[in-house]
Amino acid sequence: MTKTLALSSKAITKLTTPQLLKGGLYLTWGASLLLLFATISGVQGARHAIKTVGKDSAPSIISAQRIQDSLADMDANAANELLVKPGQNPNAVKAYEERREKVNRMILDAAKNITYDEEDQIILTLQVKLGEYLTKIQQVRDFHQRGDTNGVLVNYREAAEMIDNTLLPAAAKLNEVNRKALDRTYTSEQSAAARSLFFVVISSFLLIGLLVAIQLFLSKRMRRTLNPMLLAATAIAVIFLGYSARAFLSASHNLKVAKEDAFESIQDLREGRSIAYRANGDESRYLLDPVFASKHEQAFLNKVAQLVTLPNGQTFQTVAAASAQGQKVEGFTGYMAEELNNITFAGEREAAVDTLSKFGIYLNLDKQIRQLQQSGKHADAIALCVGNNPGQSNWAFEQFKQANQKTLDINQAAFDKAVEQGFKDVDGFEVTTPVVVSAIALLTLLGLRPRLNEYSG
């Protein structure tokens, strides 16, 4: 190896000045082409990463979570319809039909956009079991119309079992499949982005190093202190290195903001929203099916604990007040606590605190419903449960949903902005990079041609 290097060094020293200048020119052109390839390849990789996270995977996950929401809310409205005499709760009937149409459309859209093998069977399960559930609910409605309470309860229990044990788990599985795929893709794309930036920097340094070496050679061998063309080529290479590095780093940062800051909050907020829908359904089931009232009450409390658990001696008001000041409350856990402990964007804290406060109002009304039911005031409990007027349960739940939606909208806007900015960061490189590389190559040629002409003359 040492002998080979020695021979190569000896061969180089035997080269004439024109040969060295031509060699430097060709090496500079080669390094320019390498920079062109590294930059375009890196830009395309960065753009693919942003598209995969922002346009492909994330919407699929949100769609799966919205399927969960619609299923849970549809069933809650079915229970609300059954709590009163036929025709007395048109709001519940309307909401049920809207959710039915929505969930059918979303499952159909998911079937048209299958990306992973696991999705195929999950979507088939959703399609088949949803049809069975809707048929069963229609049977329940028929029994309800005839005033057959036993038929209503027996068949509704079967429908509820389909929702709880098949449909909701299938929707959750669809969400999980897409979420894991997104996590894998994100990790892979981040690594690829780091490699791309590394190659761009290395190829840039190689090109800049060659240009500097040529100028030093001219200064030493030919007593030419300054070569304006080579200086311009070097300046362009340095500026382009700074510009491209900034663009790659900014695109990587915006991808991180979209995935880790905004989208993970969106996922948690939507998961919490889905749990809240299911808890709201348990509240109605508690009144609808007295035989299993304790079971439905415990299911409600379990879901509430997933959403929010307050430390001993604290209330929703005290925790909300502390959270509004940015204080972390020890012992405060659940999805709402996680959101309040992960505030990133302007207005997010205020919206999250409002969500917590509104949920506290809803829970207070739920306690009143159970107190009325346990006091034998079944009709009053139902009226409070299905009522949409201020001070009634459905009104309070709607207030909670609106506050939750505002928090979601803030994170969604941040996600969309980060994705849009990520695309802007790497926009136009397919045009600017060839222009820059061509300019460097041409300036190098123009800078060396007079020196080469001196020897050819």
Predicted regions and their residues:
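Polytopic transmembrane helical bundles with strong interfacial aromatic enrichment
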Residues: 28-33, 37-40, 367, 436, ...
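Membrane-proximal N-terminal soluble sensing/regulatory segments of transmembrane proteins
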Residues: 49-125, 151, 258-354, 385
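Extracellular/periplasmic juxtamembrane segments that couple receptor/chemosensory ectodomains to their
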Residues: 264-266, 270-271, 386-414
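Polar/charged, Q/E/K-enriched amphipathic alpha-helical segments with strong coiled-coil propensity
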Residues: 117-191, 333-401, 419
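Membrane-interface helix-start motif
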Residues: 182-201, 415-432
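N-terminal membrane-targeting/anchoring modules of bacterial envelope and secretion proteins
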Residues: 1-23, 31-34, 38-64, 68-77, ...
